[in-house]
Amino acid sequence: MEEEKDWIVVPTWRIPGRLERWHSLIKYLKYRTGELQQVSYVPHHKVGWAWWTCSRIIFPLNKGAWLEVQGYWNLTPERGFLSSYAVRLTWYERNFYTDVTPDVADQLLHGSYFSCFSANEVRRAIRGEKILSYCNYPSAHEGQVPSLQFLALRVVQEGKNGSQGESATRKQRRRNSRRSIRLARKNNNRAQQGSGQPFAPRTYFPGLAEVLGILA
């Protein structure tokens, strides 16, 4: 008698490539800049019995909740080993959990990680003073209805001018984003934990979908 096969179905997001860049970025922000110091990085050899899981990244959030980004590999073992990768985004709170989309995951993360405009920036902008803080996670605000204050600060931050196209500030922040990911690729966990080098500037985070290359 043939043994009955049980299936466990969970929503996942396909990844067009490998997850090394994602792992390197997490380690860079955890050990080099310290911005993700509280985040737990669990590599595949510490996951345990879940052999299809290549990593777990656990982001502690407010009020005892947390967000887990779980990476999967070799999702079609019946066809032999294939370089197929995907991630699962799950939000946990006590005895409850639910899967979330990348945009919701960005909003949850930005509530605890990566700096945003401070409460005093609106007054500084009205007085014509220099803005001292910026939003380093702009993709987390997409899909929301922004306040007029936030829109005004975004205009000041990006220095928008309809006749000049993309501002120098926005270009610089995009370069900073690429630089962060490029540095993350060179991240060496063993060397960085005791390197003694000064912390890098606050990181501009482009969002989970862009970093992971999620194919919706």
UniProtKB/Swiss-Prot annotation:
Residues 161-201 are annotated as: Disordered. It is a peripheral membrane protein. Residues 170-188 have a biased composition (Basic residues). Induction: Expressed late during infection in a Rev-dependent manner. A motif (HCCH motif) lies at residues 110-141. Pfam families: Vif (PF00559). Residues 154-167 are annotated as: Multimerization. Processed in virion by the viral protease. It comes from the Viruses. GO terms for cellular component: host cell cytoplasm; host cell plasma membrane; membrane; virion component. The modification Phosphothreonine is found at T98. A motif (BC-box-like motif) lies at residues 147-156. It is found in: Host cytoplasm; Host cell membrane; Virion. Its main location: host cell. GO terms for biological process: viral life cycle. Keywords: AIDS, Host cell membrane, Host cytoplasm, Host membrane, Host-virus interaction, Membrane, Phosphoprotein, Ubl conjugation, Ubl conjugation pathway, Virion. Homomultimer; in vitro and presumably in vivo. Interacts with viral Pr55Gag precursor and human APOBEC3G. The interaction between Vif and APOBEC3G is species-specific, which may play a role in restricting the replication of HIV to humans. Forms an E3 ligase complex by interacting with human CUL5 and elongin BC complex (ELOB and ELOC). Counteracts the innate antiviral activity of APOBEC3G. Forms a complex with host APOBEC3G thus preventing the entry of this lethally hypermutating enzyme into progeny virions. Functions as an adapter molecule, recruiting APOBEC3G to the ubiquitin-proteasome machinery. Targets APOBEC3G for degradation through the assembly with elongin BC complex, CUL5 and RBX1. Binds viral RNA and affects the stability of viral nucleoprotein core. May play a role in viral morphology. The BC-like-box motif mediates the interaction with elongin BC complex. Belongs to the primate lentivirus group Vif protein family. This is Virion infectivity factor. It comes from Human immunodeficiency virus type 2 subtype B (isolate D205) (HIV-2).
